[in-house]
Amino acid sequence: MPLGHIMRLDLEKIALEYIVPCLHEVGFCYLDNFLGEVVGDCVLERVKQLHYNGALRDGQLAGPRAGVSKRHLRGDQITWIGGNEEGCEAINFLLSLIDRLVLYCGSRLGKYYVKERSKAMVACYPGNGTGYVRHVDNPNGDGRCITCIYYLNKNWDAKLHGGVLRIFPEGKSFVADVEPIFDRLLFFWSDRRNPHEVQPSYATRYAMTVWYFDAEERAEAKKKFRNLTRKTESALAKD
């Protein structure tokens, strides 16, 4: 049986028998050893190159403080990658696999109809106790419905290095602590069901995040943004 066919069957099985049930039951799930060490290493090396070459910039806050850099609230440095850039072949392969997993989830994601996603956000917490305070990725209906994070940290020891992603599932009596270990892929709902935080990191911590958009909510969010832009421009023109 061709390797591609085996991979397709494996991804479809993972999507339908693991990701979909977990998202509906607890709101999140993760897969370990997703790419394997060889391909995972290629992704890690490219991310390190981006970091060392100065491509990363301070992450910005969303919501009322949009566009503001507050290092005590959000301490990561980021850049955005489409996957087609030179030297990003391994990243592109990773993104294609995540795309296929989400595609196989299909109509089983409840009300959501996924047609597009963001670019990949490559993030580095440089240590020194940097983290990201409790927040919701999509608190106000911007279209994001699924958050996917791929971790790249070898020999990570949360007791020494911190950097745990703590999820506070809405309506649940527990919190979920996800250690950012190498080759782990995490999925969770992007809306208010999953407030989360990145606890202080005391070693360099790499991750790559993509967000998948619900088509209807995304279109409505873009419409609201266009209307707001027109109103703002009109108000400025009157001044």
From Swiss-Prot:
Positions that bind Fe cation: 135, 137, 196
Main location: nucleus
GO cellular component, one term: nucleus
Tissues in which the UniProt entry reports expression: Highly expressed in cardiac and smooth muscle. Also high expression in brain, skeletal muscle and kidney. Low levels in lung.
Enzyme type, top EC level: oxidoreductase
Domain called Fe2OG dioxygenase: residue spans: 116-214
Entry note about domains: The Beta(2)beta(3) 'finger-like' loop domain is important for substrate (HIFs' CODD/NODD) selectivity.
PANTHER family tied to this protein: EGL NINE HOMOLOG-RELATED, PROLYL HYDROXYLASE EGLN3
Name listed for the protein in its UniProt record: Prolyl hydroxylase EGLN3
Origin species: Mus musculus
Top-level taxonomy: Eukaryota, Metazoa, Chordata, Craniata, Vertebrata
